[in-house]
């Protein structure tokens, strides 16, 4: 997992082979997301606000 600069998210991991993303929140919980396209992961990692991108694009989607 790669540490990120965010007030809510601590780290993000992504496996392009399985399209599985893991997001670890600063509160301690880690969530898995399945079927995440590579461009969504790249968008998250390059977003000006990782938390806002997560809320807009990932949250409540890509459930495993």
Where are the regions a protein language model picked out?
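Acidic/histidine-enriched, beta-strand-rich ligand/metal-binding domains
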Residues: 1-64
């Amino acid at each position: 997992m790669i540490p990120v600069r965010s007030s809510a998210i601590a780290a993000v991991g992504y496996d392009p082979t399985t399209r599985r993303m893991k997001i670890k929140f600063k509160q301690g919980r880690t969530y898995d997301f399945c079927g995440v396209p590579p461009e969504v992961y790249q968008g998250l990692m390059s977003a000006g606000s990782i938390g806002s991108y997560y809320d807009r694009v990932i949250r409540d989607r890509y459930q495993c």
